[in-house]
Amino acid sequence: MPYLQKPAKQKNRQINREDRRKIYDTSQWRKLRSAYLQQHPLCQLCQQEGKIVPAVDIHHIISFMSTNDHLKRLALAYNPDNLMSLCKECHQKVHNQP
């Protein structure tokens, strides 16, 4: 019976997903996210356009997945200066930009 190997790209996505979960599933992240949303309850991009829209997501300005260095990854993930509060629509726009 032939062995079907997962394509490398799909394997990498799975590994990335697992690495992201290691951050997002921590109590440290949940507390930081909650505190940041309390301090920045409005979408920061909508505010720049003069709109008042509640934020529901927290976006990392520099993705913590942009490095393979564990310490740098943690620093990017938990640095409040690397975060933005966004509405769903703006968060999708940011991630869909080329």
Over which residues does each language-model region extend?
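Intrinsic structural disorder/low-complexity segments
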Residues: 13, 62-63, 94, 98
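Short N-terminal micro-motifs specific to bacterial/archaeal maturation
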Residues: 20, 34, 74-77
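Short cysteine-rich loop/turn motifs with clustered Cys
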Residues: 28-65, 89
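Generic N-terminal initiation segments characterized by hydrophobic and/or small/turn-forming residues
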Residues: 1, 34, 80-83
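Short Cys/His-centered divalent metal-binding micro-motifs
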Residues: 50-51, 80-98
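Short linker/helix segments within small regulatory modules
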Residues: 65-82
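A boundary/linker detector
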Residues: 1-31, 47-54
